[in-house]
Design a protein with these regions (language model features):
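N-terminal flexible/basic segments that precede or flank functional cores
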Residues: 1-28, 97-154
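Short basic helix-loop element that most often maps to the first helix and adjoining turn
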Residues: 3-4, 31-50
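Helix-turn-helix/winged-helix DNA-binding modules
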Residues: 28, 39, 67-70
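Recognition helix of helix-turn-helix/homeodomain-like DNA-binding domains
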Residues: 51-69
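DNA major-groove recognition helix of helix-turn-helix/homeodomain DNA-binding modules
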Residues: 72-88
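Short C-terminal boundary/hinge segments that cap the last helix of small helical domains
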Residues: 83-99
């Protein structure tokens, strides 16, 4: 195993750990700023004073967050004003290996079926079980080698 694979494995561990830690977490419908503020029993005016902004700015922030129209800096400032910390992550729905396996299978299926179409033109089609075996074999090889074009296409 090369250095590149070791480093990739370390990154996978970090992402898998974050995915596990956030598995049951969902963004509240009102957004985190309003939810935490209400949990603390803090008024919008009080948060505005702590953030050194207007009440209107807090209202705007609380309406923008659920729509995804807020900056990380604004969330950070609100979190600090409420005595909290901002945590953000991009995590897959499951393990990183699952994403890699799924991509390898899609890519392998496209490659094997394209080859099958060419073979059919020469009247040399494979049985469905042989096609499945070829897809599985190709997917394993793609997941292992992860060529430069791995994430391109299917």
């Amino acid at each position: 195993m090369g250095v590149k694979q070791v480093v990739q494995g370390q990154y996978q561990t970090i992402v898998d750990r974050a995915a596990g830690a956030t598995a049951g977490l969902a963004v509240p419908s009102e957004g985190w700023v309003r939810t935490v503020r209400k949990a603390l029993g803090m008024s919008g005016a009080q948060l505005a004073r702590r953030m050194q902004v207007t009440r209107g700015a807090v209202n705007q922030l609380e309406h923008a967050e659920p729509n995804g129209a807020v900056t990380l800096n604004a969330l950070q400032k609100a979190a600090e004003a409420m005595g909290c910390r901002l945590v953000y992550a991009i995590v897959p729905p499951g393990a990183v290996d699952t994403l890699i396996h799924d991509q390898a299978e899609r890519k392998a299926r496209a490659l094997v079926l394209a080859a099958g179409r060419h073979m059919a033109l020469e009247d040399q089609t494979l049985a469905p079980d042989r096609i499945k075996a070829q897809i599985d074999l190709q997917a394993q090889e793609l997941a292992r080698a992860m060529p430069a074009d791995f994430w391109d296409g299917p």
